[in-house]
Amino acid sequence: TIRSIDFAMGNDNLAYAVFKPSTIITDELLAKVSEKREELTIEEVKAYREFKERFMAFCQRAYDNDVRLIVDAEDYCFQDAIDTLTDEAMRRYNKKRAIVFATLQMYRHDRMPYLRRILDDAKEKGYIAGVKFVRGAYMEAERARAAALGYPDPICKNKQATDENFDEAVRFTMDHLDRFEMFMGTHNEESNYKLAKLIDEKGLKRDDSRIFFAQLLGMSDNISFNLAHEGYNVTKYVPYAKVRDVLPYLIRRAEENTSVAGQTSRELRMLKSELDRRKRGVSN
């Protein structure tokens, strides 16, 4: 993470660095801190303190390098602890601009209340909140865990409710851009169209540095290229790791939005059409 933050410093082609907190702490300890079901042992208190120090060290490095840092989302059972640390980091490092960004998975029905709390806190403490919106990636696991442990399902009842929650979060943030910077990560064509239209309706510059669209590298390039061509800020999200580690991540991204299936078919048709066009060009 430190290397990626340093690499991004001064590089106009890298809009953000990203890190996933669960890679530097055990799942068991992160869940225990988040769920507050049991007291931590002395060893666990020490381990969590070291985790927090590393978390804040990443944020400090991003601040020192003037690099925006996205804190990736986690499972529901981990997220409370991550939210607490991210909120603290935003208060500390986002005084003049958004350096630290929280990730909100909008398939969770509690994320709009959390977003409103972030705004209230930003106004009270005097900072700029960084928010990244995605629909979400752990639906089946979330519901299974809720059923197993007997707590309410944290997920919106259906895709329509998730879409409405996502759209509401984007509109809310756009209505309070004096206290927010936003990164919208989605392959959903309608969501991208709505934000582009909203930027224009509000009379904002299309390349307003507070607003970025994002898609995964290799996915929905038709959306990315068209947005960029029209002058909007677009970044490609690039997960990198050993294949066995990164493949499950990519599969979750494809599964998280049921509309992706239709869009993937559309992308394949476009690719086939382009290949056919090139073949005709060669033969001519």
Label each region the model flagged.
Residues T1-N284:
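Positively charged, amphipathic and often flexible ligand-engagement surfaces
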